[in-house]
């Protein structure tokens, strides 16, 4: 059974655990040294606004001295699925699909369906996906976590739109020859 993130919408962001304090959400850019500082939500500029400016299915977003991965859109459905040690998928169905697992298996078995978007460097092993409006030090709503091997990942996308399903798959594949 897939576990989907519990979110009021998006965009969603995936950060390495040690970058969480560097994400300010609706409060500011770059997190804060003291999370109890008196900040007004949506007071510009803020990290959430930076996230909302991106207009592609998936994109890197600079956070501190590295990059997070942004999942664009207001659709809150996203699950993480592992395929071995070096590959995982973000699965984004756009409505309830009875046979979603069959679509996931199709995506796993057909790597040529994917188009490369960018490369992402992961230096620590734990990744957290959450609503980009939340500050990293106080994530509201749901979150998803997945362990990943450190290294450079090729990030690619496959949009499957057929009569009974519309699903976007983002594949994170660790480059060989790390």
Predicted features, each with a name:
Residues 104-141:
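Extended, solvent-exposed segments with strong compositional bias
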């Amino acid at each position: 059974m897939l576990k989907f993130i519990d979110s009021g919408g998006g965009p969603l962001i995936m950060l390495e655990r040690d970058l969480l304090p560097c994400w300010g959400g609706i409060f500011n850019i770059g997190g804060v040294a003291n999370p109890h500082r008196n900040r007004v939500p949506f007071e510009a500029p803020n990290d959430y606004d930076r996230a909302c400016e991106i207009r592609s299915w998936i994109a890197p977003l600079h956070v501190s001295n590295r990059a997070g991965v942004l999942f664009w859109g207001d659709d809150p459905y996203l699950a993480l699925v592992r395929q071995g040690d070096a590959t995982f998928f973000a699965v984004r169905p756009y409505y309830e699909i009875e046979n979603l697992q069959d679509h996931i298996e199709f995506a796993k078995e057909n790597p040529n369906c994917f188009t490369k978007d960018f490369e992402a460097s992961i230096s620590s092993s734990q990744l957290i996906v959450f609503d980009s409006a939340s500050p990293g030090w106080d994530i509201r709503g749901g979150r998803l976590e997945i362990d990943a091997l450190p290294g450079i990942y090729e990030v690619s996308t496959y949009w499957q739109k057929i009569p009974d399903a519309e699903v976007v798959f983002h594949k994170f594949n660790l480059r060989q020859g790390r």
